[in-house]
Every structure is written in structure tokens, then in C-alpha cells.
Amino acid sequence: MAVFGESIIYKSREEIEIMRQAALVVSRTLGEVAKRLKPGITPAFLDQMAEDYIKSQGAIPGFKGLYGCPSTLLISVNEQVVHGLPTEKPIEEGDIVSVDCGAVFKGY
């Protein structure tokens, strides 16, 4: 890893490939969430499913534990604050749901 100045760190081709793999884990996780997102499902269920999926891919949840975050996904329903925590309240027909996810793969 080459360092330029004090703020830019160049990544090797190998590091970039690992970062790409981490991004693929996140993309696939969000795809799995989208498949299951429907009325009656709880954000807490989606969160556990996402954690299990990320771990099955050899990665770890990127948000869980970061700054004390207790969840794998950050889920906001309707006018809820951005990056809300998953709850047991079922999603209802017509709800607007936003989901954020992160994963760490081989340190990236």
C-alpha cells in the first residue's frame, strides 16, 4: 500500500479486488432483502436475515458494533429518521422503506 501525502492512500490491485468483493456481498445482501421485503415482514427479521447472509459469504456486517450500532442493517420506514434501527413493527402495504448495509470482507 503506497501512501501519498497524509490523506490519500493508494490501493494495490489486490486490495481493490477485495473491496470489489465486499461491495458484491453488500449488493447481493440488498438483493436478498428486496426479495423478502413485503407487508407483514419486520425490519428485525430482515436484519437477522442480512446478518446470516453476510456471514455465509465469508464477510462480517460492517455496521454492527461500529460506534455502538446494534444492527446489521439500518432501516428507515416512511418519515423515520435516516439510518433507523430495525424494529419488530411489521411493514405495511404502501410503506416507503430505505435500507443501508455494509460488509467487511478480508479487512475491507
Task: Name every feature range the model reports, one short phrase each.
Residues 1-108:
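Active-site neighborhoods and metal-handling regions in enzymes and metal-associated proteins
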